[in-house]
Amino acid sequence: HLDLPAFNHHRASDDAATVGYMLIPFWKMLHERGIHTLQAVNKEMEKLRPLGSKSNRFPKHIIILARNKVGLKNLYQLISASNLKYFKRVPTIPKSLLLEHREGIIVGSACEAGELFRAVLRGESEEKLMSIADMYDYLEIQPIGNNAFLMRNGTVDTEEGLRDLNRRIVALGDKMGKPVVATGDVHFLEPDDALFRSIIMHARGFDDAEQQAPLYFKTTDEMLEEFSYLGEEKAREVVITNPNMIADSCERMKAFLSEKGTYAPTFPGANDELRNMALKKAHEIYGDELPEVVQKRLDKELNSIIGNGYSSLYLMAQRLVHKSNSDGYLVGSRGSVGSSFVANMAGITEVNALQPHYVCPNCRHSDFDIDRTKYACGVDMPDKDCPVCGAKYKKLGSEIPFEVFLGFKGDKTPDIDLNFSGDYQPVAHKYVEVMFGEGHAFRAGTISGVKDKIAYGYVRSYCEANGINAGKDEMDRMVQGCTGVKKTTGQHPGGIVIVPKENDIMEFTPVQYPADRSEGDTITTHFDFHAMDDRLVKLDILGHDDPTVLRMLKDITGLDPQTIPLDDPETMKIFRTSEPLGVTLDELDCDVGSIAIPEFGTTFVRQMLKDTRPTTMEELLRISGLSHGTDVWLGNAQELVLSGTATLSQVICTRDDIMNYLILRGGDPSMSFKTMESVRKGRGLTPEMEEHMRSIDTPQWFIDSCKKIKYMFPRAHAAAYVMMAFRVAYYKVHMPLAFYSVYYTVRADAFDIAQAEGGAQKVLANINAIKKKGNDADKKEEDLLTILEVVFEMNKRGIELLPVDLYKSKASQFIIEDGKIRPPFSSV
């Protein structure tokens, strides 16, 4: 601002000289204000000080285009710095930083909020304007409608005055030899879309939201007409010639590195380490000479994993799980990683993906000669003794194809999702950074749009404020126009993006803090991870209650959850009746015992259990798949089961069912896989897929069911969740005091002692009071309702809730005391 000469900061002699240079223009400013004494300076400062506050230091807008890959990286570095180091209400870029990263980028002067336009508006001298414009590669002018607000606020008198501002910028460009470009400052596509922007801006508190500038995407003819006052030749130059020249100077490139496909992290010697690890474990379980089924599956998977460069990803997950287990916390697998037998042998998942089989824990003899049409889950097979040594066989296998995880050609990017204890999740996140080094592990960023319910609130508020009496169809149209508009940025609850050591995150994405915090340790990708999920590997390290619950139950009871038999008959019964609990729960309109069991405790799933009355682990697994999909059970499989068209074992429950079923009927494996992928993503069936299904006599109900599905769980995910849930259920049946105390402790935030004390009848009255509210019950009451149902069941089982005691209660932990449960202070 003062045109000071270059100098070395914080060097006394330079600082003193610079202050001297500053004084000269300051004296001039003082004289212009009629100030000639020190007292007058102090008095004037009272008026000037508010003008210099941070709230009045508005940054100027600029446009930055990446000309080439060097420029793209510089652009990402500027975006990152603006979000991490220079965020002041909005991301800002110091001019000095922009000049440091000038290579490969093109800088435009932007809209009315740009430095140049504002200087023109202030009537700065030509010399000053040339000094400002010197930094820009091209100068921008925009339709006068964009700046009509300057007439409304009295800054410019007429439309011709707005045109004169543009004329001055054009003349400046001509004099300096800089291209002038007509731009639209486009914020929406069609003119009518201005209404949606008005609604959004009204929701954000703008007083002039209804007075929208025509910031729609104009055609070339519209732009030529808009700038016709410059003359035909000049109008074509700013609308067509110069924009094309700038566009042509930019290389065609993608937003992130893509030459190699997926850029996966690597560990030295990972291929051999993973192979040796998997084979060692397989030999420990299945003997020195591996059964053909085991050897074939290992060879197939290892060749695909190693051949596609995913060994290091497996090792990374293995090390995380091993560390968590060593620290005393179980880890549950999510997603389709349980489809990999190698993952099971490496200790990443408990799910054994092989076909159902017996194996002897003593002599390692195995039996794979099982009727696979009768058993899909090894746990459901009858007990059997080893014919070699007489020891009781272990029953393993979940019948899950590997292709669900990596595809038939190993070309599907693997996504390893792991459920860590919520208490342990931060430790696991830090350990990833230790493994790969600082600057190579980032939280996966998310971009959230306006949800339809929020959009409805925006529209209703806008209509009320403007006296608009809109009908339902018009309201729906306005809601639809606002739904999905970017609202904020955030972070994936557990996703960690890994950048290989030989790469830089700036080759893929800028980085930033999540929108709800402007500092701290959490740095996320600037792009939504889904935009680049085929380029960088994401490891999902999620926090989950189940591992925490099982750790606490183990500490209280001394029973290791991994030793719990997954075929315990009494535990299996509670998924079809409350009889093993010794109570009936008719008052809750519930005749199963699965209340408070993960994945099976909600009213929705309890109704599914009532409809299906499962008796096997396989049926529980299928119910889990049905309950987590979208349009898989309701209006689909439920109707097929209740009408007798198909049984629970026949309907589509998990995505694997589609591929397995089609291949079993003689379908082409590759087409069967593509069909599964299309259906599970909610894309339905292509004519080619439907023709393939009919060629192998697929029943019409199966085809129709595929068309209805919007999303499906993988079988491996369901298997992992059901194993965890069954273990928790075992404690509920056989060790109820420990179960209830831990359940309440983990959900202490929702517990309200005033509502939960007083015995079964009082608790039931409180339950009914909340139910009577229906949809008017708030989230807190809905969470409390679940807690109260558990308390009611516990009371009926003869377990009392003691009062909070100043001397006996803990801070936040429910404790067992004389066959009863004492709440903590946090429950008050």
Labelled PLM ranges:
Residues 70-193, 276, 280-316:
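Domain-core and long-helix interface of multi-subunit machines
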Residues 2-46, 249:
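Acidic, Mg2+-coordinating catalytic module of metal-dependent nucleases/exonucleases
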Residues 8, 12, 178-192, 333-334, ...:
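Short acidic/histidine-rich active-site segments
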Residues 188, 199, 207, 265-828:
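Noncatalytic, beta-rich nucleic-acid-contacting surfaces in large DNA/RNA-processing enzymes
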Residues 31-56, 495-513:
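Common nucleic-acid-contacting/processivity interface regions adjacent to the catalytic cores
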Residues 62, 194-277:
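Active-site or pore-adjacent capping/gating segments
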Residues 28, 49-87:
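Hydrophobic or amphipathic alpha-helical targeting/insertion segments
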